[in-house]
């Protein structure tokens, strides 16, 4: 059952709520069934007593109105189907309906922002990405998702498993929005681009673990990746790989592959310090970054941020980056 992220540090800008149905974070991770496939968006879940457990009833929060998917932190627009509207019983849809993906995008971006706020950002620490982000469900069959800093919006693709059916794809893209809010234009070098991809993967794992923990947390996008991977478990990428800097950089450079160096360092920080302290340090450090920062320089700034939390934290963060060749 997804955990409702709340607490005294969460800033609630608007009060409207509504019932909804989502995957948490996705059927493969949730049910532990690696043989699930897309089947052209068919809803084969509802009629099966085991598979129907992949659907979770949740409460959408921070809505401007309980009638539509627009709120304090996200506004959803569909370009390939009718816009989701409250049916009277809430936003209860199944995966064969385009509206299900819209609900997923709204819920998981809101949960990501609420998690960040629960760490103190916006209260005891500067706010991070506390703005309304637009989300477009379109791409007309393209299996790709991306964040555009020029428009401050996220586009989620519909090729293969529709990207918005996997919470970790949604939150990964939100990670780019987070970094753009902290450092305008972030990601203008190969290293900075890799940091962006690595952080997106890590944030996806961090948020999904906070809301709906699963056994294999280090596997990113278990459901979306069933359309383009043959190995089991199915993962877009993992955050517990073995790559080091600079010997394992891709040639030519490829930010997603190189991002696995950064995400592993963040994962090790999490294992050493625990989720909440690690995530606070990781996110807070990004205020010190520059648009074209190198991985070693970003590691140095993260270590400096960790020092604010005491010598044990600084030592653990230094060790995590040293293991990746970054300190």
Regions found by a protein language model. Name each.
Residues 1-170, 177-327:
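Zymogen propeptides/activation segments of proteases
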């Amino acid at each position: 059952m997804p955990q409702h992220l709340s607490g005294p540090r969460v800033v609630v800008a608007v009060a409207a709520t509504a019932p909804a149905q989502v995957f948490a974070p996705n059927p493969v991770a949730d049910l532990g069934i690696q043989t699930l496939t897309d089947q052209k968006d068919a809803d084969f879940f509802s009629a099966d007593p085991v598979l129907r457990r992949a659907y979770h009833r949740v409460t959408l929060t921070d809505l401007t109105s309980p009638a539509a998917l627009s709120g304090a932190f996200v506004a959803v627009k569909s370009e390939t189907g009718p816009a989701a509207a409250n049916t009277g019983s809430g936003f209860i849809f199944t995966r064969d309906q385009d509206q299900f993906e819209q609900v997923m995008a709204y819920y998981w971006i809101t949960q990501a922002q609420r998690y960040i706020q629960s760490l103190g950002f916006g209260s005891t620490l500067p706010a991070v990405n506390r703005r309304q982000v637009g989300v477009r469900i379109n791409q007309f069959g393209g299996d790709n998702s991306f964040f555009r800093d020029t428009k401050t919006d996220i586009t989620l693709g519909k090729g293969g498993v529709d990207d918005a059916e996997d919470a970790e794809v949604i939150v990964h893209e939100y990670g780019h929005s987070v970094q753009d809010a902290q450092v305008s234009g972030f990601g203008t070098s190969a290293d900075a681009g890799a940091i962006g991809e690595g952080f997106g993967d890590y944030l996806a794992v961090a948020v999904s673990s906070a809301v709906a923990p699963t056994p294999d947390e280090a596997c990113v996008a278990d459901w979306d990746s069933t359309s383009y991977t043959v190995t089991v478990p199915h993962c877009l990428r993992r955050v517990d790989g073995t790559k080091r800097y600079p010997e394992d950089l891709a040639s030519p450079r490829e930010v997603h592959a190189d991002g696995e160096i950064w995400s592993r360092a963040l994962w090790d920080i999490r294992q050493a310090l625990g989720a909440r302290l690690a995530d606070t340090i990781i996110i807070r450090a990004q205020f010190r970054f520059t648009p074209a920062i190198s991985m070693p320089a970003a590691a140095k700034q993260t270590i400096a941020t960790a020092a604010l939390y005491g010598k044990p934290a600084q030592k653990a963060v230094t060790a995590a980056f040293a293991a990746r060749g970054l300190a």
